């Protein structure tokens, strides 16, 4: 569950992927745009995956 407390990382690349991260302040999985590189573990392809891992 450590990845769920990691910050959202958009990354320096310029791709446009809609992903989800767990926002530890709100306790919810939230969409964001991921650039495609240099992210972290708090980066999920689907809302369902985010909720399953982080129990949101």
From Swiss-Prot:
Disulfide bridge positions per record: 4-54, 13-37, 29-50
Main location (coarse class): secreted
Domain BPTI/Kunitz inhibitor, first and last residues per copy: 4-54
InterPro entries from the UniProt entry: Kunitz_BPTI (IPR002223), Kunitz_BPTI_sf (IPR036880), Prtase_inh_Kunz-CS (IPR020901), TFPI/VKTCI-like (IPR050098)
Signal peptide: none
GO molecular function: ion channel regulator activity; serine-type endopeptidase inhibitor activity; toxin activity
Record keywords, A-Z: Disulfide bond, Ion channel impairing toxin, Nematocyst, Protease inhibitor, Secreted, Serine protease inhibitor, Toxin
Pfam name, any one: Kunitz_BPTI
Other comment: Negative results: does not inhibit Kv1.1/KCNA1, Kv1.2/KCNA2, Kv1.3/KCNA3, Kv1.4/KCNA4, Kv1.5/KCNA5, Kv1.6/KCNA6, shaker IR and hErg/Kv11.1/KCNH2 potassium channels. A synonymy between H.magnifica and R.crispa is controversial.
Family as reported in the entry's similarity comment: Belongs to the venom Kunitz-type family. Sea anemone type 2 potassium channel toxin subfamily.
Protein name: PI-stichotoxin-Hcr2h
Organism: Radianthus crispa
């Amino acid at each position: 569950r450590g990845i769920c407390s990691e910050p959202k990382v958009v990354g320096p690349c310029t791709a446009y992927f809609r992903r989800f991260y767990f926002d530890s302040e709100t306790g919810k999985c939230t969409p964001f745009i991921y650039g495609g590189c240099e992210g972290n573990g708090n980066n999920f392809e689907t809302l369902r995956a985010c909720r399953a891992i982080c129990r949101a």
